[in-house]
Amino acid sequence: MNQYFVYIIANKYHNVLYTGVTNNIRRRIYEHKMKLLSGFTRQYNCNKLVWYETFNDINLAISREKQLKNWKRDWKNTLIEKDNPNWNDLAEKWFLKTFPLL
């Protein structure tokens, strides 16, 4: 079964948010963190995953993304803070490098 994700990323000051949709959240967040994607998120340094939702239907995911993009900033803040009150980077440990002991 395919999975789709709607996500919100922020810059380190939490004053810029970006909402997106993807079928591979780890890959997409990695692309944002490494600045592999040109455009808004690269320009405003949005690379901190602060919220995401999972869907089994791409159409529902796209509808949710569109809905969130039309929300007021306060509504998005409330959504994020409901599950992530400290605005932690939910992907912080996804890309840690491990080194073998010598």
Question: What kind of region is each of these model predictions?
Answer:
Residues 55:
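Short, surface-exposed polybasic/aromatic micro-patch for ligand or macromolecular engagement
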Residues 66-80:
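Short arginine-rich
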Residues 1-38, 42-52, 62-66, 83-85, ...:
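GIY-YIG nuclease catalytic motif and its immediate N-terminal context
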